[in-house]
Design a protein with these regions (language model features):
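C-terminal segment of classical bacterial N-terminal signal peptides
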Residues: 19-27
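N-terminal leader/linker segments that initiate helical-solenoid repeat arrays
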Residues: 27-104, 110-111, 115-118
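Short helix-capping/linker turns of helical repeat alpha-solenoids
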Residues: 78-81, 96-97, 110-114, 126-128, ...
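Hydrophobic face of amphipathic alpha-helices that form TPR/SEL1-like repeat modules
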Residues: 85-92, 119-126, 157-162, 191-198, ...
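TPR/TPR-like alpha-solenoid signature
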Residues: 86, 118, 139, 154, ...
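Structural signature of tandem alpha-helical TPR/SEL1-like repeats
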Residues: 95-100, 131-140, 167-176, 201-212, ...
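Alpha-solenoid helical repeat scaffolds
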Residues: 103-106, 142, 178, 214, ...
Length: 360
């Protein structure tokens, strides 16, 4: 489900910087020969990738979830079936009979049934079996939102934020997003948490947002699971039982396919953040993220191959992942020195492997 509140984008980096200062430093333990630093928000050309000493290690740069604003969330858990007279229309909608669903829902929508109004809004907003009509979709979402339908309040809030089919209205959008979040809509909970962080700088906003991130995370939103993991790891004054769950929440987000969570989980496992070190599993998660196209993970994976952390040393694989990350703009002087020091045939093999690479 898309989350396009562009109003929040300008707050992203500032909010991330706030989080970095929200809690005590997390000392990242060094691996025997190397340490993987936490991903940051700096441009690729300044991404720190050379070896670090214990004094160089810095805390996490914060909830990278803010980089995801405007991106697509993972699929939500199945919605509960509508109850009452709209069931038949919703059943037709689920089977792909959109015109039938429209015909059956419209009379109920005209009589003020919020569930039917939401269904009409969904059909019109996506152009399912009918011509896409954002303006009329906004009308029906608005009616359903007035009637208290949580899904409609969320959709209508997004439209108000973007001025899509309805004039922009920040105050009204925030109000409906809050109401949808309080009603338990998981995507609204995530968005309302984002708004709270943006509108309340510092630790105050993070603590206000945390309960909504937690509720959304419990319902399967990977972005929220990632946020919970980072906040549990960095916020001060949280109960120890929550801090102990930070890695588990990161793992949930990683298992849901969130590549940034896969990257961070790999780093946490290698560095022993939130639990014992596990070089093999850390390697596996970084490789998964790297195969998915995450450039920072490709860079870190190259370091693991160079230093034989969680895997056997493999100069060709190390060079391949370095070539891929360098092509994406992530400079790394240490890996460049390594690359220039291997044999010509190894360089050639690495380039050929990089050329054949396809994201999985």
């Amino acid at each position: 489900m898309p989350i396009p509140p562009a109003r929040l984008l300008k707050y992203c980096l500032a909010s991330m910087a706030v989080l970095a200062a929200a809690g005590p430093d997390i000392a990242l333990a060094q691996a025997p020969d190397s340490v993987i630093s936490q991903p940051g928000t700096a441009p690729a050309s300044t991404f720190r990738t050379d070896r670090l000493t214990g004094e160089d290690v810095k805390p996490s740069d914060g909830v990278g979830v803010f980089d995801r604003m405007g991106a697509k969330l993972p699929d939500l858990p199945p919605e509960k079936d509508y109850k009452g007279p709209i069931d038949e229309a919703y059943g037709a909608y689920q089977r792909g009979y959109y015109l039938t669903a429209m015909d059956k829902a419209l009379p109920r929508a005209q009589l003020g049934d919020p569930a039917a109004q939401t269904l009409i809004g969904e059909i019109l907003s996506q152009g399912l079996g009918v011509k896409k009509d954002v303006k009329n979709a906004a009308f029906w979402y608005g009616k359903a939102a007035e009637g208290g339908d949580a899904a409609a309040m969320f959709k209508y809030a997004l439209m108000l934020m973007e001025g899509e089919g309805v004039p922009r209205d920040k105050v009204k959008a925030d109000d409906y997003m809050r109401k949808a979040a309080e009603a338990g809509n998981p995507s609204a909970e995530f968005n309302w948490a984002q708004i709270l962080v943006a509108d309340n700088p510092g630790e105050k906003g993070l603590k206000l947002a945390l309960p909504f991130y937690e509720k959304s995370a419990e319902q399967g939103i990977a972005d929220s699971q990632y946020a919970v993991a980072q906040l549990y790891a960095t916020l001060k004054d949280l109960p120890e039982e929550k801090k102990r769950l930070a890695r588990e929440w990161m793992a949930r987000a990683a298992r849901a396919g969130f590549d940034t969570a896969q990257l961070d989980l790999g780093i946490w496992l290698v560095n022993g953040v939130g639990g014992p070190k596990d070089y093999v599993k850390g390697f596996e998660w970084l490789k998964l993220a790297a195969n998915g196209g995450n450039v920072a993970a490709q860079n870190k994976l190259a370091h693991l191959y160079v230093n034989a952390i969680g895997t056997a040393p493999n100069p060709v694989e190390a060079a391949k992942w370095y070539v891929l990350s360098r092509r994406a703009g992530l400079a790394d002087p240490a890996l460049e020195d390594f690359y220039l020091g291997i044999e010509d045939d190894q360089q050639k093999a690495a380039i050929e492997a990089a050329n054949k690479f396809r994201r999985r």
